[in-house]
């Protein structure tokens, strides 16, 4: 008999894994706060901004695939939050439009992974509470002064390109360790789309420099 997701009760694909009830626990290296969930954006403590370390790992079925899914979702949500907070901070209309376009692309990627692996993410991981949002945003854009009307634009592009390249390379690595099949296809497609994001950012960066 086919298994079903305990949250949405949809039938699972034979080769898939349901992440609905999977929770990890992290402990902040600085203040000791414990945090529980499927992912924590940027691995930061929402109380003090310190770095979290894994305190309780997943020990259920198919831990190898679950670890790959968890890492992929974390990369996508990290980029999602980068574009979301960048949109809110910048006063440049062109940069905001570029960040908004990529924000929605990352939103689609998260929805695709959610559909396939049934994470049923806590809405607070996407729409962070105010204090958590401030901590994550300050950490993401550390060293970038958004008060400089044009001074911040190049720095935002450069930081986004570095992060997108890192994400693209990691998705390729994940695809390469998976056997042929739908899981490998998912990560190969995500890698290709992240590469497209790099191209968009590089084009906009070049246009900004040449204007």
Located regions from the model:
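Non-heme di-metal
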Residues: 1-211
